[in-house]
């Protein structure tokens, strides 16, 4: 492990790389151009709901793509429950050279449905996918 000096403090090369990437910000127009590109087919999954074939990308794959195109992005949620339905409002913030920019979306799930996962994580995943689409990521799948 190599030790280097940064602002009078000794840190490892791994810590230096972390600082470099944490402070890295791209121009917003470049980020948005990349996010609007169609997602590669290897990330796209398929499921059938009520007889219709649906194309989708898992939230964790979208998370990886966001890490690649918009390093340092932030995801914040607020949840509510009315007794039968969970609602999540998610805010996806991109850190660009020009500043921080946020777009929000909602996700919801009935609490009594027998679905994979739990209502809260399903609603959050839906809000995240929708927030990504508001930035252009995966938007071509919604049409």
Predicted regions, residues:
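Positively charged, aromatic-enriched nucleic acid-contacting surfaces
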Residues: 50, 57-143
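N-terminal, Lys/Arg- and Ser/Thr-rich interaction peptides
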Residues: 1-54
């Amino acid at each position: 492990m190599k030790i280097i000096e940064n602002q009078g403090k000794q840190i490892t090369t791994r810590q230096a790389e972390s600082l470099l990437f944490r402070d890295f910000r791209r121009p917003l127009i470049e980020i948005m151009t990349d996010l609007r590109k169609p997602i590669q087919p290897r990330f796209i999954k398929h499921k059938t709901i009520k007889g219709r074939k649906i194309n989708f990308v898992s939230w964790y794959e979208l998370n990886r793509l966001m890490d690649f195109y918009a390093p340092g992005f932030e995801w914040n949620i607020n949840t509510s429950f009315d007794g039968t339905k969970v609602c999540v409002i998610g805010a996806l913030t991109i850190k660009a050279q020009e500043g921080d920019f946020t777009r929000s979306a909602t996700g919801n799930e009935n609490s009594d449905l027998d679905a994979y996962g739990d209502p809260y994580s399903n609603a959050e995943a839906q809000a995240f996918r929708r927030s990504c689409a508001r930035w252009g990521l995966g938007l071509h799948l919604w049409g």
